[in-house]
Amino acid sequence: MRPSVITVAVLFVQSTWASFAFGNPMSMRNKAHTNDLVNSKGKPLVGRFLHITDMHPDIYYEKGSTVDHYCHSYDHNSDDTPLGKSKVGYLSPGPGYECDSSPALIDKTLEWLKEHQDDVLGGIDFILWTGDNSRHDNDNHFPRTQSEILASNEDLVNKMIEAFPDVPIVSAIGNNDIYPHNIMEAGPSSMTRQLAGAWDALIPYEERHTFEKGSYYLCDVIPDKLAAISINTLYLSNKNAAVDGCPDDNLDEPGSLFMRWFKIQLEAYRLKGMKVWLLGHIPPTRGQWYEDCYTSFTDLLYEFRDIIVGQLYGHMNINHFVFLEFDKLPVDTESYGIKSAQPKYVKSLIDAQYAELPTFPENLTEEFLNGTVGNYSLATVGGSIIPEMFPTFRVYEYNISDIANQLDDREELTEITSFNWETLEEQSQSDYEIDKKKKKKKKNNKKKKKNKRKNIKPGPLGPAYVPSLFTPISFKQYFLNTSNYMDATKDTEISYELLYTSKDSPYNMPDLTVPEYMRLAKRIATCDKPEDPHQFKLQSGDQNTFRISKKKKPSICPIAYTYLWHAYIGSISDFED
């Protein structure tokens, strides 16, 4: 019997690092000890990082066009030209329309970030960028092409690097970053190779082969201490007709092969004593992922809860969070549409998941934290730059106070090697044959056990659960009120403003651990904290103060209303059924 994939990875200790690897650990370690408190580009750490997503630049956006035509200019002699429709502005059409981002919005946003990343944002250690770097394929008059998509990606990558030259940027592929959208076959392919070329400046040299194979990769953002794994959620998405989920008995499926690769990387990072952020585009919710992909993924989240710091996604354009529970399928929520930005989705999430979370005892016990809270992991979905709502991004603060004290504890860590795709596929195929035989035996056994809990031994609770090194402490949500820039020109200077923070009322979160998010979710669902139901202030300034009419009693309580208002970046204020 041949060893398993994980065993093979460990047996490669003391050999040289192959192409399917983390890179040379000795060179990274030497660099880390030169100046321990720096990111992977040598910049001193400040304890903050940026999450940005769904920029959707549109080269065909044109000032003076109409929203009925997706902000594209048609032939004025065409019968398709609407009469009496309002014209869109230079920067955006304002919130509520299905237009992608104007070149001006992208350029001015990145210019603002470049200019104010230190004085306003307080400095950035690394960036997690969760995809959709091309426009939507929603206008038959302007069909997308593969060359346009690749050019859009390469252009945006170059602009991001220009804005953040000393900040490591890790990006994840979006469903609109490929041609045709949503559909992606197993790699290597022309699409994966050309996308690797467009993203060349982001992908570590030693990860290039991996990316060409599956369009996912990994990258150290703090050398030898903190990494980010970019997930290709297209291989896990049930909207991708070119794949068939993540069956554990068919390694021809790219989703199954990804899960094997993913587990190997987590195992190796654990052995190196490192922590990991996960980022992807399509969030793991019902109706988005294949169920077997969701199940395999949550199994790994549970098993490696000691090293996974958190997960960030995009795609849905609304700020919210969901919980993934080990050994349970995702909750059933109402579908959403980008056209209407349906508040029903988040409201159904509150009812179906938040309300059903376990109630915390007055005195927390280790048993409750390990046995109950530890079954849950948190996925945060970010608001977008695309101006369908107000453009937005989030800056996280995370704990680096103990980083220097923990360096000496890992001096003698074993150097783990990895291996190339040929080795992975060979060993995985062997495991596949073994698994097939085991499953055949089980099928022939008439005695079946019902509801048997999976035999997975999890790690201890890590920084996602217990405040410690790299635990996210708080966040600040910034937004651009495009309604104030309808008359903007190329000379207009824009200003992103602070919308709210995780420490603001009514959230009052001491940190961003899973237990604190569970408490918040329960408060949102049960209206645990009484507030004035007729008036509440979301942020200083008349434009962000909303009053609920006393004549009409709201169907949702103020804390839930505030959460919904923030989810839709202040662009929607009516959440009544």
From Swiss-Prot:
Keywords: Glycoprotein, Hydrolase, Membrane, Signal-anchor, Transmembrane, Transmembrane helix, Vacuole. Residues 437-456 have a biased composition (Basic residues). Its EC number is 3.6.1.10. The keyword Flavoprotein does not apply. Residues 430-460 are annotated as: Disordered. Residues 1-2 are cytoplasmic. Pfam families: Metallophos. The chain crosses the membrane at residues 3-23. It catalyses: [phosphate](n+1) + n H2O = (n+1) phosphate + n H(+). It comes from the Eukaryota. Processing by proteases in the vacuole may be required for activation. Its main location: membrane. GO terms for biological process: energy reserve metabolic process; polyphosphate catabolic process. GO terms for molecular function: endopolyphosphatase activity; exopolyphosphatase activity. It is an enzyme of class 3 (hydrolase). Residues 24-577 are vacuolar. The keyword Lyase does not apply. GO terms for cellular component: cytoplasm; fungal-type vacuole; fungal-type vacuole membrane. It is a single-pass type II membrane protein. Catalyzes the hydrolysis of inorganic polyphosphate (polyP) chains of many hundreds of phosphate residues into shorter lengths. PANTHER family: ENDOPOLYPHOSPHATASE (PTHR10340:SF55), SPHINGOMYELIN PHOSPHODIESTERASE (PTHR10340). Belongs to the endopolyphosphatase PPN1 family. This is Endopolyphosphatase. It comes from Schizosaccharomyces pombe (strain 972 / ATCC 24843).
